Amino acid sequence: MLFRSVFSARYAGPDATYADNCVHLLAELDRVGSGPRTARFATSIVLALPDGGELDARGEVVGVITDVPRGSGGFGYDPVFVPDDGDGSTFAEMTPEAKHAISHRGRALRAMAEMVWEALPTARTQE
């Protein structure tokens, strides 16, 4: 199964809630049987520069899908995703700080911030 962009928000139907999407995903995984339940979240950020150039950053986190939802924090598929880089908690069980430290969005934003910092040498000299 592959979810892309806004389609993941409507996976269980046009009016589905986050919980509906998680339940639907788990039911689909049960239907296809046992096997690896690996998953990954990815985010790309592009910054258009005044000179026509672009900066492109990507963040990714790999993990597994749980058998049942766990936790009440976060949003979307957070209750069913356990990142490989974590402590065995789902994203929904983590504090926001712990999640953002390893999330795909956090990684992409940190990578973009580094690229912007390197692309703007005048900003470094004003500190």
Regions found by a protein language model. Name each.
Residues 1-127:
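Anionic-ligand binding patches
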